[in-house]
Amino acid sequence: MISLNIEKTFGFISKESVSAYEAQVKAAQEALENGTGKGNDFLGWLHLPSSISKEHLADLKATAQVLRDNCEVVIVAGIGGSYLGARAVIEALSNSFTWLQEKKTAPVMIYAGHNIGEDYLYELTEFLKDKKFGVINISKSGTTTETALAFRLLKKQCEDQRGKEMAKKVIVAVTDAKKGAARVTADKEGYKSFIIPDNVGGRFSVLTPVGLLPIAVAGFDIEQLVNGAADMEKACGADVPFAENPAAIYAATRNELYKNGKKIEILVNFCPKLHYVSEWWKQLYGESEGKDNKGIFPAAVDFSTDLHSMGQWIQEGERTIFETVISVDKVNHKLEVPSDEANLDGLNFLAGKRVDEVNKMAELGTQLAHVDGGVPNMRIVIPELSEFSIGQLLYFFEKACGISGYLLGVNPFNQPGVEAYKKNMFALLNKPGYEEESKAIQARL
């Protein structure tokens, strides 16, 4: 079970001030359970782990196997919540050098539709020219510009290279049940498709086919991922006392820190494989809480790498920050520091020690230094990098996010602000229906 330690926040806030949130947290939990809070149309994630059927998982696994059998490369086309959850899990569990391994046990997973970089898309299409590839197109509407543009390119290339019949076999849609361009295309072309539930927003969708299908294609155990999430669903339930509920304590602590002037939360990891977990977390909390002119700004760093870039600012910059450190208790491999007769680097004092022991001491030393420098620290410990533990971590953050948003007084399940850039972009591109906006924006240029 993952654990949360908030002791290194005391001195900046008190244990009593965190405990004082108990009644507010209970009200937030009840609002989530009863569907009486803001954004109550998007609570399908709340009990998703415990409600996923074995039949549904079997269908996902079977489809994943078709892609695995027929593709050496699979492109996940999506943006934001439509790809970050899957990528977070896949990157956390994959060999760091899987690209370079001659014998691969699963298709190479590549991501598209998350940017509009012409060079990126050109280089991707060039790379795919001699590859047996498939596509998982993830979009509820099918009209999100970045993803729709990438899919248009990939669909044509797949059909041209592999033929219409094989393309039909290796293109899978994850989209709305009834409406939208992606649904129409899937039905017209005869693609296998999975449904994005209407009551689950993108950033909470990692345990729907949005995340589960790509994760299964990559060769990971989605049943164990779901089981881990279900375990945490129970541990963070509304019936669990405040003092024993990690999601409740995390939500309360970060809100109390925010109330005391800590406006920026930095998610820290000392494991490079967790980089995309941080990226997923940034979207989860940024879109959920950044509204109504308030909200904690979610930032992330990879230590010890970023200690050599951001470490100075964190140690001695403006004291508006707090850190939440994700620590992995047990690594998957063993590597000892060798002895060297010349000892020119002066590292023989580490000879015989595990590399992970050095990393753990860097973690502890950094935490103490940052606390001494005025940065409150929370610490989340996950037992290992496994499907079960990652499933626990994802649900922990989701549940805490729902509670935290209600404590903040915002709707954690909408994102009205993301439409502003789209409106301007469509006006600048002269999209039909945006004529008036186009005139107005041209006058500003």
Swiss-Prot record:
Molecular function per GO: carbohydrate derivative binding; glucose-6-phosphate isomerase activity; monosaccharide binding
E.C. no: 5.3.1.9
Free-text function comment from the UniProt entry: Catalyzes the reversible isomerization of glucose-6-phosphate to fructose-6-phosphate.
Cystine pairs: none
PANTHER family in alphabetical order: GLUCOSE-6-PHOSPHATE ISOMERASE (PTHR11469:SF1)
Xref: InterPro entries: G6P_Isomerase (IPR001672), Phosphoglucose_isomerase_CS (IPR018189), SIS_dom_sf (IPR046348), SIS_PGI_1 (IPR035476), SIS_PGI_2 (IPR035482)
Record's catalysed reaction(s): alpha-D-glucose 6-phosphate = beta-D-fructose 6-phosphate
Gene Ontology terms: biological process: gluconeogenesis; glucose 6-phosphate metabolic process; glycolytic process
GO CC term (a single one): cytosol
Chief site of localization: cytoplasm
Compartment(s) of residence: Cytoplasm
Pfam families assigned to the protein according to its UniProt record, in alphabetical order: PGI
Alphabetic keyword roster: Cytoplasm, Gluconeogenesis, Glycolysis, Isomerase
UniProt cross-references to CDD domains, sorted A to Z: SIS_PGI_1 (cd05015), SIS_PGI_2 (cd05016)
Protein name per the record: Glucose-6-phosphate isomerase
Gene name of the record: pgi
NCBIfam families on file: PRK14097.1 (NF010697)
